Amino acid sequence: MRTEYCGQINLSHVGQQVTLCGWVNRRRDLGSLIFIDMRDREGIVQVFFDPDRQEAFTLASELRNEFCIQIVGTVRARDEKNKNGDMATGEIEIFATELTIINRSEPLPLDSNHINSEEARLKYRYLDLRRPDMANRLKTRAKITSFVRRFMDDQGFLDIETPMLTKATPEGARDYLVPSRVHKGKFYALPQSPQLFKQLLMMSGFDRYYQIVKCFRDEDLRADRQPEFTQIDVETSFMTAPQVREVMERLVRELWQDVKSVDLGAFPSMTFAEAMRRYGSDKPDLRNPMELVDVADLLKNVEFKVFSGPANDVKGRVAALRVPGGAALSRKQIDDYAKFIETYGAKGLAYIKVNERAKGIEGITSPVAKFLNAEIVESILQRTAAADGDLIFFGADSAKVVADALGALRLKLGRDLNITNGSVWAPLWVLDFPMFEDDGEDGLTAMHHPFTAPKEMSPEQLKNAPETAIANAYDMVINGYEVGGGSVRIHNGQMQQTVFGILGITEQEQREKFGFLLDALKFGTPPHAGLAFGLDRLVMLLTGTDNIRDVIAFPKTTAAACLMTEAPNFANPASLTELGIEVVKKAKDRPSEND
């Protein structure tokens, strides 16, 4: 039906007859001429109708926005004065000789000239996707997946599919369950990741595996989370952690070069402990130069228990955050930031405004100055490298609260005060995570997942001191987003059972939930390691949006609902009966007597 795409016509086509298919993006009737901007997935081209072609001209008078049409016409070069530098096709236009209205359109429920609510955009997603910026994001996504496949194929990786209907295993989030009609009372789980299957593939001898795969997690959503998401899943045998990181870093560097023409350079690395100490985050945004600076040793003896208490507590921390130019902040702005960090458990936000650095304590303004002497103030100013016009915020609490609160404040200040350099890319590797973390109930939980190997520990050493274990794990972070995470896996049955035991999984539960894995580990398992990238996050970064729903064709809301199809919905009672399922309403869901 077409010979060219609208957005691909240029001066080389001048004089040629073309057939185009697409939509009316805009129509202008000048009386003697009718102009339309015609749009398809590749872009927009100007088409004009002349009364000399009476049939086409008369039909063109009926055109309205979003009519689906086909035109036949001749490509002409525009006069110099009529060229449009804002359009990729602005040097040419089409003189239409034939017009077919394929389908008419009712007035759109979306306004192309204004910002529509996200609810309206998701309800009419098929119309929202007609917008060039949305179409371009999905085209970029397709380009990314094509690039990844070529790269992985060139590196000798095999694209192998793993099951969608599998067994529920504890991986940190709730599973989406699928009832079995054949096996009454039993359920499949949709995979949170292909983790165990890709490890089993290593045991099968497929030493380089990858897959671009859907994963499912029934968890509370955020701007960068969806209940179903896509991973670039990778696993290797007989490769060390540095070797895995080298290949995956090369993939990302070449991807950025291909899509953005940007050289990311070699990725720096830092340990989890360093990242938390300096940035209050295990995924630090290095575009922001501000850092947390420990000052507890300077404040142990002050008569201000808010400082001295945490400073003398082995689990406490007192840290300072210097804000360049922050002395210009008003009291209300500071109070707003204090309220902001309450979300992270902080109870207050002490500060020092540096008016004249050379004057020491005489050159500052601070509500806590009365608790500090000149020597302490000078040490704080020196350690934080404060200058005239700066502001220093303090966090004093448990180490976790200080890291969480000041880490979040650092990011917010970076955005609010334009301290974060939005024109650069800042990738890094974060290494050496703790293997376990406190679950809040006198137990431990795996920081990554229970199949991650510890660094340089025997099963007996791990069992005796699990809280000291460092995981052989690594995360790739770009501009404050964790875009990929991986680890060396456990390939020893005794070590795997030891980890399960530390996590409180009984031997009976181990057999019930992971018997197939424990059996497989008995048969010559190779050392293996891998990584998974969040494809949606990669596309989000590469297309310059901060909302993951912008890079998924048909996403869910933050309530995990599809406004377009109205999923989820109630199941047919007959289907539930066939599955042996009865829906039991909770008391709060039942209608009251007054309803």
Curated annotation (Swiss-Prot):
Annotated InterPro entries: Aa-tRNA-synt_II (IPR004364), aa-tRNA-synth_II (IPR006195), aa-tRNA-synth_II/BPL/LPL (IPR045864), Asp-tRNA-ligase_1 (IPR004524), Asp-tRNA-ligase_1_N (IPR047089), Asp/Asn-tRNA-synth_IIb (IPR002312), AspRS_core (IPR047090), GAD-like_sf (IPR004115)
Residues involved in L-aspartate binding: 171, 217, 448, 489
Catalytic activity: tRNA(Asp) + L-aspartate + ATP = L-aspartyl-tRNA(Asp) + AMP + diphosphate
Residues where ATP binds: 217-219, 226, 482, 534-537
Domain of life: Bacteria
Gene3D superfamilies: Bira Bifunctional Protein, Domain 2, GAD-like domain, Nucleic acid-binding proteins
GO molecular function: aspartate-tRNA ligase activity; ATP binding; nucleic acid binding
Keyword Ligase: yes
Function: Catalyzes the attachment of L-aspartate to tRNA(Asp) in a two-step reaction: L-aspartate is first activated by ATP to form Asp-AMP and then transferred to the acceptor end of tRNA(Asp).
Similarity comment text for this entry: Belongs to the class-II aminoacyl-tRNA synthetase family. Type 1 subfamily.
Protein name: Aspartate--tRNA ligase
